[in-house]
Structure formats: structure tokens, C-alpha cells
Swiss-Prot record:
This is Uncharacterized protein in ileS 3'region. It comes from the Bacteria. It comes from Staphylococcus aureus. The keyword Oxidoreductase does not apply. InterPro entries: Fructo-/Ketosamine-3-kinase (IPR016477), Kinase-like_dom_sf (IPR011009). Keywords: Plasmid. The keyword Nucleotide-binding does not apply.
Length: 131
């Protein structure tokens, strides 16, 4: 496991930290605190702006009433960028939920951005900015 001083995170009373598998760009963790659970994304050796595009995407989804984790904090500690989110437990999805999400995402992709192009005004793919 990557060594990181978790005591510097803006969370009080951290009790347990568990790695979560599945990501290919970031290290991910479940963080249990006294009365709350968090999802921590950590990117070693990067500046605090590493997660800026992800944050703008989450805000865009929130504006479209798509439930996403609440953004708690982001920053840089010990030369590592982090993104701290609300932890959402696994749930059950139903066919109607998939249909609704598909329609919302399709409508989002129809919109033209400030550059008079489809999609977001910035092109970001898994840790690198593409031009």
C-alpha cells in the first residue's frame, strides 16, 4: 500500500482506511470516520489541480439532477493530490433507472459548449489533457 499521512486529511476521527480496487489512474480508498464514510481518490506526485476536470464533470452531472457523490474536499498533501467524496454504498439498479440515465446523458451530449463544439469545453482523458 502507498504510504501517505492520512492524519493530514480534513477528516476528524479516522478509524479505518481500506483500499478499493478497480481504478486504473488513481489509488482509491474507503475511509471510515466516527459518523461518516468517505471515498478518497489519491494521485501520487501530482498537484492539487489534478482533479479539477473531474470536479467540473461532477458539478455538471449535479446540475442535470444526476445523483453523484457530494464533493467534500480536494487538495494536495505530501506532494499528492486528493479528492474526497461522500461514500455511496452499492445499490440495486432497475431497468427504468438505466433508461432515465441514458436519456439524461444523451441530452448532455447534444449540447454545444462555449467553443461551439459538442461535449465539454476541455478534453480530458484519464490523467492527461488531450489536444
Amino acid at each position: 500500500m502507498y504510504n501517505f499521512d492520512y492524519s493530514k486529511l480534513p477528516i476528524k476521527n479516522i478509524q479505518k482506511i481500506f483500499p478499493i480496487a478497480g481504478g486504473y489512474v488513481n489509488l482509491s480508498f474507503s475511509v471510515d470516520a466516527s459518523n461518516k464514510k468517505y471515498f478518497l481518490k489519491l494521485q501520487p506526485n501530482t498537484k492539487s489541480n489534478f482533479f479539477d476536470y473531474e470536479l467540473s464533470s461532477l458539478k455538471e452531472l449535479t446540475d442535470k439532477n444526476i445523483p453523484v457523490p457530494q464533493i467534500i474536499n480536494k487538495g494536495e498533501l505530501d506532494n499528492n493530490s486528493f479528492l474526497l467524496l461522500e461514500f455511496i454504498e452499492n445499490g440495486h439498479a432497475y431497468p427504468e433507472s438505466y433508461r432515465k440515465l441514458g436519456k439524461i446523458v444523451a441530452n448532455m451530449h447534444k449540447n454545444i459548449n462555449s467553443l461551439n463544439l459538442f461535449g465539454f469545453s476541455h478534453n480530458f482523458n484519464g490523467g492527461t489533457i488531450e489536444f
